[in-house]
Amino acid sequence: MDKIKLGFVPTRRSIFSAPDAIKYRGLTADRLREIGVDIVDIDDINDEGLLFDDSHIEPIVKKFRAEGVDGIMLCHANFGTEYVCARLARELGLPVLLWGPRDERPEPDGTRLRDSQCGLFATGKVLRRFQVPFTYMTNCRLTDLEFERGVWDFLAVCNVVKTFKHTRILQMATRPFDFWSTMCNEGELLEKFNIQLSPIPMTELVQAVRDAQADEQAMAAMLAHIRDSFEICIPEDKVPAVAGLAIAMKRLVDKYGCNAGAIQCWNALQDELGIMPCAANAILNEIGIPVVCETDIHGAITALMVEAADLGRHRGMFADWTVRHPDNENGELLQHCGPWPCSCAAVKPKLTYPLAFDHPGALTAEAKHGDLTLARFDGDNGEYSLLLGNARGIDGPAGMGTYLWVEVDNLKRLEAKIVEGPYIHHCVAIHANVVPVLYEACKYIGIQPDLYDPIEEDVKAYLRGE
């Protein structure tokens, strides 16, 4: 599972009980550690370990940056000091979780010790004034279910933001000429989102494969992995090319400091190596390096976002929307030539031939059924959005490649969304419900969430703890 560091910032206000604020600072920190959260506290910033003065901001910023914090939690241990919270949050520029523990029953004389909820109202307004996006977790008790769920969902949001803002994609050759749908604006991706491409020519990839094939130790290990993972249904003399390509892509990803890849797939690669890249893609996808087909840069970005939203617990499946189910009016075939990881398959994949080409190197396997999230990051004319929603695996006719028949609530509505854009026939599926996390992450990365079902109020209700 991916690791995220949370900067824990309890805050107080002078007119309410400092001892109670200190008490709830400790209780909250203990609860966060109990549920497995890696926190960086501010206990060494002042005697109370609380934020309430401007002088605390600089040392907190310095500490959190040195520790590599990925997001912060503004914990209103009592009312809190809203303007100092906002100044800190703006200076850090990280995702912000705003929360306070539910207040106790007033004292017999009517005295209230903390007024944490009231402080949340104030801080929410001031964060808006400072133009700081934030995530609100409902005012609840430390032992409430929504506390643990809300914290972990926020950590997943932080992971999406962190991944998205530190993405570099290995672009292996140009897009296929016939695939105008996968064109992207490299300069705009960098200017808007800090998403970088590392383009290399096909000749460099082919040479890297040749170099890999000369490495006997690496080849022996990869060939053993292939034989263990796949049922071999191609000529034996083609298997080393698959192994060499997988090794080469991993080395090039490392060389250029990338976290994903996009490959041209056809036709130049077949002229040089005599194989399709699908199985090699699947091998890298399995180890958490998404490699997508047809040089679909936006598809690679989608894959990174979807897996980050699940904290790396499951692998994504880069797919085509292909044909409607012959018997189910809301059924659709998700399929591609074979890049899906083995962990997604319901059976041992066959290393074989693809649907539309004569060269070996594809995989065939139906994916596991179950509940899914489907997503697609895309854009045109300077505007970007994230199509997302839910689906479930269903039975259907046998297929070629890696495939899964899915059912959505209203296929006609989804179909229109894809056609009218800015999306294309590619998406990424994952065996997890990460719709709320992706929806929330959009506010931090400057793209518009685009739900293909009318579930926005349900998503918001989930996020606020209902």
Show the residue positions of the predicted features.
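N-terminal basic/disordered segments at the start of proteins
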Residues: 1-35
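Cap/lid and interdomain-hinge subdomains that line or gate substrate/regulatory clefts
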Residues: 2-6, 39-40, 100, 104-221, ...
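N-terminal beta-loop-helix "entrance" segment that forms/cooperates
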Residues: 37-66, 207-216
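Short, well-structured alpha-helical segments in soluble
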Residues: 55-69, 88, 247-255
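Short Gly/Thr/Asp-enriched flexible loops that form oxyanion-binding sites at enzyme active sites
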Residues: 78-93, 270-282
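C-terminal catalytic subdomain
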Residues: 133, 285-401
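Long, internal scaffold/assembly segments composed of regular secondary structure
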Residues: 221-222, 228-309
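Extended hydrophobic packing segments that form well-structured cores
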Residues: 358-466
